[in-house]
Amino acid sequence: TNIQITNSWIGVNNWLIDHVLPETKWDISIDPELDLNMQGRYLMSCNHQSWVDTTVTQYFGLTRMPLTRFFTKWELIFIPFVGQAFKILGFPMMKRHSKEQIAQNPALKYQDMDEARKACEHLLSQPFTLLNYLEGTRFTAEKKAKQQSPFQNLLKPKAGGLALALNILGQQIDAFVDMTIVYPDGVPGYGEFWLGEVPRIVVDMRKINIPDWVIGGDYEDDAEYREKFQQWVDD
């Protein structure tokens, strides 16, 4: 199947990481409450610093979790090979209208929500890991300063996508997983990683309990729920 082919490709990458590149020390810590398996259904959040992060999640997850997918923009389907791969592998692809378009036609917002719901529900026919980079973009000191983020090593989280996924999938997932990736010797570029210039990578995995009030809320239209959800994510 397409997923087996993809996992074989990831397996080759992992073999290269383990046997060809200069040794990288992996320090992986997993919450005892996390019972990860290849048949599970997981929603996962992760900090985002480098393109290497995706390779790290693949390296970690190959024998522990189903193939990691993430929300992608529908427009990417028109990029040769990349877009087709996302589609074939069942990545949830979303059409999003601009704020200007929604202002002219508010019904488009609910059309976008319906598209997202269908994309998430499509995942439920199989084991999955759905990854959400809460920051929405890679962390840099410049972006942190511009945002005036209160967090030392994180940008302000964009919680809307997580709220949507939890409300659609929350009662049917086996765990909500928080992954933290740390590069103690400095954040590497993708080329640096494949040149073996990353001495150590730290990965911490923990289970996040989902409060009952989270499921069934309306992040878009309920200001009280939105504020409470944002505070939960910040904490």
Task: Cite the ranges covered by each PLM segment.
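A cross-family acyltransferase "interaction/gating" segment
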Residues: I77-H97, L124-D218
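A Trp-anchored, charged/polar loop motif used as the substrate-binding/catalytic surface
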Residues: L108-H122
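A short, well-structured juxtamembrane/interface segment
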Residues: W15-Y42, V56
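Catalytic core of membrane glycerolipid acyltransferases/transacylases, capturing the structured
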Residues: T1-V12, L36-M38, Y42-N105
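Short amphipathic alpha-helical segments and helix-helix/interface helices
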Residues: N13-D18, Q58, V82-G83, C120-E121, ...
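Short, glycine/acidic-rich beta->alpha junctions
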Residues: Q49-D53, Q111-E115, K156-G160
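Accessory terminal regions of nucleic-acid processing enzymes
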Residues: G216-D235
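Short, flexible/disordered intra-domain loops and linkers
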Residues: T1, Q101-Q111, A145-Q152, E220
